[in-house]
Structures are given as C-alpha cells and as structure tokens.
C-alpha cells in the first residue's frame, strides 16, 4: 500500500492544477481538466463503474456494493485543484525515508531549510516516510493526498472482496481553493446519503464545524492633484484604505486568533492616490457574531461615506459559506462512525473546528452532509508543505473501516 501511495501521490503533484480566482471558466484552469481526464482513466483501471467527468470538470465514480444488506450510499470526496498562495508549477517532490526528526535542507542553493524550531511538530514524524518540496513550490498535498488516499482505498476494497461494504460513490471536484468547488456539484447525480471530505491535516483530524464566511471588496475613490497644490483638493484613496483598516480591532486578525475565535483578514490591498482596492475575508463560527462582524464593516463604510462623500467608499460583500455543524448534527451518526473507525485503528480522534474552508461546508447546505477527515499533510499552501506517507496509510485504513462499519451496522 505504501508503494502505491508514494507512486500515485508523487505523480499527481507534478501536474499543475492551481485554480485561478480571476478566471470565469469552469474549471478555472486547464490543468484541472487534464488531471480529471487522467483520473477518469485510472478509476476505470482500478475497476470502478459509472465513471464520469462532466463539462465542468467534476469526476464521479461508483464502487458497487458487495453485500445484500440495505446499506446507505456513502461518498468520499477530494478536490483537484491546489492553492494559489504559492507557485504550484514544476513541483519536485522529495522523498525522505525513515526520517530522523531533524532539520531538512529542502534547497541547498537557496538555503531553504525545514526546521523543528520553525515547525515544532516536525520531530513527531521521526521514523516516518515523509515527502517534502524542493523549496521552490508548494507540494499540493492539499488535496492530492486526500485524492490519492481515496484511489488507494478503492483499489484495496476491490482486491479484498472479503471486506463487505455498501455502494460507495467517489467525487473529485475543481476550484475548492477559491471557494467554488460545490458551485456546479450535482448532489442528486452523486446519489449519496452523506459523504466524507478527505481534506484535513495531521493524524486523527475529524472536523464537522467550519467558519461562517463572507468576502468584502472595498473600492476607495480619491482625487489626485499635483502634490504641490494639493491643499484642500487631494483625497488620497490609499490613505482612505488605511483609515478603514484602522477602524477594525487589531487583535481580531488571523495572526492573533485561534480555536473558536473569529477574525477580519485583509487579504489584499493595492492602488494609488486615485483609487485603491482592498479585499477582506470575514470569519466566525457563531452565526450572531458573524452577522455582527459584517455589520461592523458596513458601519465603518457608512461613517466614512458621511465624512468623505458617498462615492469615497464602495462596498461589495457576499456570504461564501456557513458553519456545517447545523447540517451535521441531525445525522450525527456519520461523525460517530468515523470516530469509532479511528479508535479501532488506534488513532486518537482530534476533533476541532476547521479554521478554513472546505467543500464540505457548502455541500452540507446543499443536502450532502460532509464532515472532514485527516490526510497527513502539514504546512499547506507554501514551500514548507510536507506529508507523512505513514499517516496517509492510516487515512486509507480509516476510509476502508468506515465503509466496513456502515455495512456491519446495516
């Protein structure tokens, strides 16, 4: 199993599938189409049926039941795309067998080193086989680790028919990293009662609470004149943006929050005297606090409009997804089975809220309750990203055990 995990994963990450927020196509990048087509062929080779890829790049497949019991149809999902935060082109995965727990020089020429001082969890992987980058790209374990694990688990179940299971549906979705993953997902065609998203992090991760999320685009309009004669004439749009940001609580930013704490995050700011644009994301687990944060944004805008004029600040704000807990609670047994599956494999479940987005959040509100399970990756979205193959193997075992338990309990 370990060899198959390494072979598939290292091959998959070399395909550039970064999504593109500025694109209006679906998927947003051709690499995702290329990858999807490859997976269609490999799913068929493994032995799955009803393998499809629609015009929007969504890949679906079926592992038929091998039991006569009336078992609910369950799904396993992962996403095709990788993050846009750092380059994902020309990924060169580096395999470190029997890792000694010490610092790893990723790139000697550029002096890029993965150190326990910077990443304290690193020594806990001593003895594992880990896969890192070469320091010049992200790795893409988010979410090609999860995708690989699903492929390997399906292959294992097909070759081990003594493990009884109901019908299993598999789906690989595009554009998750830019929040568009479920936009064209056909829940009815997928046909599962519920699903598990293989898109988590370290060993034991089991997540069924997510942020409530919104995005806010602010355009600040200034008046540019010659600075030598600017008195009482110039209005500096960049300073308006700075003023707006100054009204937000400093301590309620990502770098100062954890656990169940929400935040405002200035994702980008660019412009000049004439016009500046800022993009914020707003996050909170509590729906009332979430609405209060959006009201704070709106109130600051109103205050600045009263001070500088209606055209000085233009706000576009939209909700992105909601806390999936509300949709998971009525079918809590899907969490319980995943929890029990981990315990039976001597994995200690680590239940914590997702401080980020996952397709599962939106899918849960579309009628497909979808908690999130660990995949074995660390330090996603950057050059220090790595994955433990040993933990990936555990994730495969969890998928298999979940399928087995649903059949056993039917």
Swiss-Prot record:
It catalyses: Release of the N-terminal residue from a tripeptide. NCBIfam families: peptidase-T, PRK05469.1, PRK13381.1. Cleaves the N-terminal amino acid of tripeptides. The gene is pepT. This is Peptidase T. GO terms for biological process: peptide catabolic process; proteolysis. One of its GO terms (cellular component) is cytosol. HAMAP family: Aminopeptidase_M20. Its EC number is 3.4.11.4. Its cofactor is Zn(2+). Belongs to the peptidase M20B family. The keyword Protease applies. Binds 2 Zn(2+) ions per subunit. It comes from Bacillus anthracis.
